[in-house]
Amino acid sequence: TEQEFFISEDGRANSISHSKDDIIAYSDKMSTEEYLEFIRERLILLRELLSDNGSIYLHIDYKIGHYIKIIMDEVFGKENFRNDIARIKSNPKNFYRKAYGNEKDLILFYTKNFKNNIWNDIKVPLDENEIADRFSKIDENGRRYTTIPLHAPGETKNGPTSKPWRNIPVPKGRHWRTNPEEFDKMDAQGLIEWSSTGNPRIKKYADEHTGKKIQDIWRFKDPQNPKYPTEKNIQMLEQIILQSSNIGDYVLDCFAGSGTTLKASNKLERKWIGIDSSDVAIDVIKKNKLGNYVYYDLKNKISEQIHNATYKQVSLEIIDESKK
């Protein structure tokens, strides 16, 4: 979601955003209870709209995220909770007295059905520090590498991976990583490093590393010069879309804001639906180069009908009727 709410010191949920031209895009102030009910109603509808293999990511202020998680547990089921992701949004700072500085917000990740959700298990590259740390050796061509044992855990009683190689026995409780004949080929290619004591190890090069699994702390800082308040980091949105959807799938952002989610979806060949109640937001989105799309301006009467609808099919029937 593009629209973020924050909790003030008096416990009220605020949503007051200014566009780049200082035009107010949103202006709401609700009690925490009102806001939680506001979110609950929308989450119930989103659950009905979500495909059986779909996922939902809710980006929220850290002061209210723990309340929202309880609601999402109720709506989607505790078993469908996948992650509470900490997103580093800014450089360290401390504007609070007698408290630690805040540099993160939260992304709650749930699925419709954890046994069936799309999960593409994408990898991300190592950063420069990780490369230097993991691949500390440099060969004669300037390539960084590290070494690993020729053997791996688990004993095999029979077969070539249990036999000695060049008179070197397999350590107890271990087996060769590959057929010893492959070791001969690797050694001829210079891919095995021998120590001064005659211990062989396999070379692994940094430039052949396929990347690392994504963890639950993300470093996607807010855009430096946003075109719209609460604009999200597009690389973060691309990562989410790549992980939890496939080409041709639908991506829905029901607080579309500047349309960054829609832009990322369009780039990654996903179909997209963006919704926003702010005329300023809609104007910004329509100016983005998003290719061909259909735009519906729902009148107040139609919006109220959808708001009061209890099931996905009812909502879709109302939208279809409004087209006539």
Please name every model-derived segment.
Residues 1-284, 291-292:
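Core catalytic lobe of class I
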Residues 279-324:
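PRPP-dependent phosphoribosyltransferase catalytic core
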